[in-house]
Regions:
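Non-catalytic alpha-helical scaffolds and adjoining flexible linkers that form interface surfaces
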Residues: 1-193
């Protein structure tokens, strides 16, 4: 994982086993092997893509975002937040995008600090206050309302995990990959959450 290759699959019929012709495009795995934290991010992203994306279905937006994430893995202060955005994009590409633009209750576009765990829509502080124990936290960086703050990546990972489990994995009788949990443990140990 981590190397970009050009792969061409050929078979006489689509149902046949076929074979791949693979040529290296960009080899970056060597750099990632030297950084256990970055490697855990790469493993988590690969495992999530494998668990969530249907076979034989093209998802070019996820692939492009994945390339951006791989490039960012060499910048430890940047990639954890980018990983959260990648998971949110994965949800969106699968048809389960979060609506973080305006409050589901009032329609306002400011003071968005919660997400409804049922609808996946943002909720403002005022409208969500009576239900705050049941709401998921919405980090500002996920909807462009501020810089990355301490705890935002952890909140973002919890948010995306909730919806990936509920809408993608559980219906397919799957669980979040262990590689994602290991990445979170490493991020905690490094003080990056």
């Amino acid at each position: 994982p981590g190397n970009r290759v050009r792969a061409v699959w050929r078979a006489r019929l689509e149902e046949h086993l076929g074979h791949f012709q693979i040529e290296p495009d960009e080899l970056s795995a060597g750099h990632l092997m030297e950084d256990p934290l970055a490697l855990s991010g790469l493993n988590a992203a690969c495992a999530m893509a494998s668990a969530c994306l249907p076979e034989r279905e093209a998802h070019p937006a996820v692939a492009e975002a994945f390339e951006v994430l791989i490039d960012a893995l060499e910048t430890p202060e940047l990639w954890p937040a980018l990983y959260v955005r990648w998971e949110a994009g994965l949800l969106a590409d699968l048809g389960y995008g979060l609506d973080l633009r305006r409050c589901a209750a009032t329609g306002q576009t400011h003071d968005l600090i919660y997400v409804s765990p049922k609808s996946g829509r943002a909720v403002s502080g005022g409208a969500g206050a009576p239900y705050k124990d049941r709401m998921l936290a919405l980090p500002g960086f996920m909807h462009g309302a501020g810089d990355l703050e301490t705890g935002d990546v952890a909140a973002g990972l919890k948010l995306t995990a909730h919806f990936i489990q509920r809408r993608v994995l559980w219906p397919a009788d799957k669980q979040l990959p262990d590689a994602r949990a290991r990445m979170i443990e490493r991020l905690e140990a490094a003080g990056a959450l």
